[in-house]
Amino acid sequence: MTSLLFVILNIILTLHLCAGQTPAADNNKRLICYYDAQSYLRPGFAEMKLSFLKTAAEFCTHLIYGYADLNDDLYEISSLNVDLDMFHYKEITSLKAEFPHLRIYLSIGGDHDNGHYDAGKYMRFLESGKDRQNTFIESAIHLLKMNDFDGLDLAFKLPTNKPRKVHSEFGLLWKKFKKLFTGDFIVDPDAALHKQQYTEFVGNLARTFRNANLSLTMTVLPNVNSTWYFDVSEIYNNFEYINLFSFDFLTPLRNPEEADYTAPIYLRDEENRLAHYNIDYQMNYWVNHGCPAHKLNLGIATYGRAWKLSAKSGISCKPVVRETLGPAEPGLQSNISGLLSWPEICSKLAITNGAGYKGADAPVRKVQDLERLYGNYAFRPADDNDEHGIWISFDDPDFAGIKTNFVKTKFIGGVALYDLSYDDFRGLCTGVKFPILRSVRGHL
C-alpha cells in the first residue's frame, strides 16, 4: 500500500512539474509562431537550423512562414527569395508529418517586402478591381497547394499612423489650438474607399479559399490604423483568426528623440502619452467593434527596441526618456539598428559585477515592472561625450507570461509570437532553448 501511494505521489508531482510547459496538442488556446525564413541564411549563431525549429514546433499550434511578396506588375503572389523558397517551403511544411497537430501558413507582406515599406503597392492592389485580384487569388491557391501549406496569412503593409512628435509644453498648446482649425493630419484621404475595397477583397478571397479547402488569417501590423482600413464586424468572419501586433508603438526609427515602453499592456496616463499606445486599447477596439475575443491573438515580440542615449537624457532614465539619439548600435545576432534579440538583451543583463567593464561593455541596469502593467526596461547612461548610452524596452520570458495571463483573463483566443528567430533558440542565456516561447505556452 505504501509503495502504491509513493508511486501515485510521484505521478502527481511529475504532472505538476510538467504543467508549466504543456505541448501544443494538449491545449485549446492558439500559439501562433512566426518563422522568418531569412533566419535560415543568417551567419553564425543567428542561423536558425531546422533542428531548432523542430524544438519550437512541439509548443506551437500554428507556424507562419514569412514572407511572400505581392508582385504588383503581374498581380500575383511571388517569392522574396526564390533560391531559398524553392526547397524551403516544402522543408518546412513537411514538419507536419512529425508534428501532426501543427498547421502551417504562408504570410504575404510583413516587414520584409523587398526591404522597404511600400504601402502604396497594397493600395494600388485594392484599387485594381476584381479581375486582377482574382489573378492574385489563383496564383496564391496554386502556390499554397503545390507546397502543402494549410492557408495564407494576410499581413498587408497598409499605411501607418504618423509617429508621435516631441513637443515642448508651449508646442503642445499650439498643437491643440491649431487642431481646432485644421483637424487631424490625413495619412490616406481615400481610407474609406480602401476600407470598402479591403472588405470586398477578403470576402471574395475567403469564399474562394473555402472552396479550395484552404484557411485564411490576418495579421494587423504595428501602427496600422484599424479604424481606417478594417470594417471589423464585416470582415472578422472571413478569417480563422486575426493576429494583432500590439507592440512597436514607439521605435527608435519612428521616435528617435524619445524612448518609452514599446508594448505596454495598459496606458500609463502621464507624459502626454497617446491613449491607443497599449494592448488593452487595441484589443478593446476590435471586440467593441464586433469581433469575438476568441478570434483574436495577442502579438508578443521576442525582441526589444534600443535607443541611443545622450548626456542630456540624464542618469535616472525613467520613461519617457528625452533627448535620445535614435537607434542604438545593432547586435551581433540581429544586425538591425535599434533592435536586440532576447539573447542579445540577456547577455547585457547577465553581467552581475560591472567592475572592469567600461564603455560599450559596461553592464546595463534592468528595471523590472513591479506593477506588471507596462513592461521592463534596461539602460546604461551616456557619458559626457554622448557615448555608450543605451535604453532598451523589452519583454523577458516572465513578462511574456504576464501578457499571456492577460490573454486568458480577457478570453482572447491565443498568442501570436513574433519571431522564433529572436527568441533564445540556442539556449545561450540560461541553457533553456526558446525561453519566451516556453513561458507563453506554460501560461496559456
UniProtKB/Swiss-Prot annotation:
GO terms for molecular function: chitin binding; chitinase activity. It is found in: Secreted. Keywords: Developmental protein, Disulfide bond, Glycoprotein, Secreted, Signal. Glycosylated. It holds the Pfam family Glyco_hydro_18. GO terms for biological process: carbohydrate metabolic process; chitin catabolic process. Coiled coil: none annotated. Glycans are attached at N213, N225, N335. Residues 1-20 form the signal peptide. Disulfide bonds join C33-C60, C346-C429. Gene3D superfamilies: 3.10.50.10, Glycosidases. GO terms for cellular component: extracellular region. Belongs to the glycosyl hydrolase 18 family. IDGF subfamily. Lacks the typical Glu active site in position 157 that is replaced by a Lys residue, preventing the hydrolase activity. Its precise function remains unclear. Cooperates with insulin-like peptides to stimulate the proliferation, polarization and motility of imaginal disk cells. May act by stabilizing the binding of insulin-like peptides to its receptor through a simultaneous interaction with both molecules to form a multiprotein signaling complex. This is Chitinase-like protein Idgf1.
